[in-house]
Amino acid sequence: MLTRHCNRLGLQIENKFVFRSSSWNCVRRIGKIACNENKYRYEMTSTEEDIDSFFSRVFGEKNYISDKSLREQIVTHKSYKHGLKRYNEPFVSVGNAVIDVCLLNHYLESGNFSTIPSYKDLVNLRSPARLAEVAKKWNPETATQCILPLKGPNSPSSSSFEKIYSSIVSGLVAVVYFQKGGVEAMNFCKKSIISDLTKDFVRPNTVHNQ
């Protein structure tokens, strides 16, 4: 089945490597392309001390999350080392789910059911841009590990950093959930994230009365 699929795409398999067969004079091994072919890229890396300092800023102590490899994974984006090092993406969906619950609780505690946001509102509240804004108070750039491709000799766009830093925030929530439990994760969210997400948020004119 894999062979048929490759043939449909104009690819051929030889000695377990995939080749593009359209021009055998310039055959290239897909997956073997040198990482430095695009000379325009922006790399961020950090030391163990940088990561420890970041976790100290977030939690008040670097060893709140005792596993060093987990600490490094949370600040590592999948683009770093071409995904060969453990990265934070597997934690993001769990972190986002916990943040959603905390946001909903925040509005339920008001006792005014007309203020309960729709799911679309919740997603807007924890958009990458807003989560990245939360991360700024911890100076994540000192610990982040990632590689951003560039179209030219310019700095990466702000939206690129938003995706990187928001994944760190969601990863932090998730790792607290897995290491310390749901109650601790909710407390961390409420104390360090929710107030920042909601303070300047303007809801669309959609009121949901149940």
UniProtKB/Swiss-Prot annotation:
Q: How does it assemble?
A: Component of the mitochondrial large ribosomal subunit (mt-LSU). Mature yeast 74S mitochondrial ribosomes consist of a small (37S) and a large (54S) subunit. The 37S small subunit contains a 15S ribosomal RNA (15S mt-rRNA) and at least 32 different proteins. The 54S large subunit contains a 21S rRNA (21S mt-rRNA) and at least 45 different proteins. mL57 forms a heterodimer with mL44 and stabilizes rRNA expansion segments 1/2 at a membrane-facing protuberance close to the point of attachment of the ribosome to the translocon in the membrane.
Q: Which InterPro entries does the annotation name?
A: Ribosomal_mL57, RNase_III_dom, RNase_III_sf
Q: According to the lineage, what is the superkingdom? A: Eukaryota
**Keyword Acyltransferase appears in the UniProt entry:** no
Q: Name one GO biological process term.
A: mitochondrial translation
Main localization (coarse): mitochondrion
Q: Where is the transit peptide?
A: 1-59
Any idea which UniProt keywords this protein has?
Mitochondrion, Ribonucleoprotein, Ribosomal protein, Transit peptide
List GO terms (cellular component aspect): mitochondrial large ribosomal subunit; mitochondrion
Q: What is this protein called?
A: Large ribosomal subunit protein mL57
Where found? Mitochondrion
Q: Which organism is it from?
A: Schizosaccharomyces pombe (strain 972 / ATCC 24843)
Entry similarity comment: Belongs to the ribonuclease III family. Mitochondrion-specific ribosomal protein mL57 subfamily.
The keyword Transit peptide is assigned to this record = yes
State the Gene Ontology terms under molecular function. ribonuclease III activity; structural constituent of ribosome
- Give a short account of what the protein does: Component of the mitochondrial ribosome (mitoribosome), a dedicated translation machinery responsible for the synthesis of mitochondrial genome-encoded proteins, including at least some of the essential transmembrane subunits of the mitochondrial respiratory chain. The mitoribosomes are attached to the mitochondrial inner membrane and translation products are cotranslationally integrated into the membrane.
